[in-house]
Amino acid sequence: MRTYSPKAGEVTHAWHVIDAEDVVLGRLATQAALLLRGKHKPTYAPHVDTGDFVVVVNAEKVALTGNKRDQAFHYRHSGYPGGLRKQSFGQVLDKHPERLLEKAIKGMLPKNKLGRAMGKKLKVYAGPEHPHQAQNPQPFEINAKVEK
């Protein structure tokens, strides 16, 4: 029996929707990255994009454990001398909650062309609504919710 190697045209990409409400940021990011890479499929191959589309809703309600809201920072650089900008996770979450999730998830993908293609299949929305109902996304449950 020969080893099966998936081809780019043979792969079907399903759609998953994840509700981020009260889910710990890192636990959500690892599950989303796993779906984007396609490691949940028996036909996974590291050199082919076998992953699925992931829609994350309620990004503004994601949970941060401990004091990360105030003590963990998000850095970005303009490219100019002295252009380093630093914001706490809380500031980023208040202003652009989808950016925090996108950075966490994309940081868990490969740093090459294939990883960038996988990152394009990630759709993050701050609220409960998303424009992808026509794709019939299947709910994906994450069991790492924070008890309040």
Swiss-Prot record:
GO terms for cellular component: cytosolic large ribosomal subunit. PROSITE patterns: RIBOSOMAL_L13. Keywords: Ribonucleoprotein, Ribosomal protein. InterPro entries: Ribosomal_uL13 (IPR005822), Ribosomal_uL13_bac-type (IPR005823), Ribosomal_uL13_CS (IPR023563), Ribosomal_uL13_sf (IPR036899). It comes from the Bacteria. GO terms for biological process: negative regulation of translation; translation. Disulfide bonds: none annotated. Coiled coil: none annotated. GO terms for molecular function: mRNA binding; structural constituent of ribosome. Part of the 50S ribosomal subunit. PANTHER family: LARGE RIBOSOMAL SUBUNIT PROTEIN UL13M, RIBOSOMAL PROTEIN L13. NCBIfam families: rplM_bact. Belongs to the universal ribosomal protein uL13 family. This is Large ribosomal subunit protein uL13.
